[in-house]
Amino acid sequence: KTVYEGKHDTLGFTYVDTQNNYNIYENEYFLPMGFAYTEFMTESDFERAYITNQRHSMLCKYIVVPDEKADYYSQFMTRVYPNASKARAGEETYKASVLERREMCCSEFDYSSYGFNAKITLDKPNVVLFSVPYEADGWTATVNGTEREVLRVTYGFVAVECGAGENDIEFS
């Protein structure tokens, strides 16, 4: 039995099996590795808009960027301000946001002990987030063979700028 027993159904988890005394659940709201957003908030705006125990449910709705980089991200997506956000933290917003992210996610993702590769097709230029920890001098990235800056977003994940059309992304 788990601490979460009885709560999985409301979170989109479906019980599958028990093996070796472990309950196995399938998450119908999983996200593939690598996806883009249509809206962003700066770190300070995000912290003002949502109290600590609500923030986790909004991280699929907005990419969160350093305050000083707001102008850069504005060229790719819409900035949302705390008082203008109509999205309410909660389960329904989370589920809807996951479905939105799946519309702009990588079609392929492979990894090795040296890094990872991904492919994504975008209608317009955007930033693609990977839930991989950012390291200041750790990662290098290329998109379609051209070196790109590794961006730190959403409190410590990596992202990279991609163009419209097909993008072959490599992190090493």
What are these regions (language model features)?
Residues 1-99, 123, 144, 167:
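Extracytoplasmic
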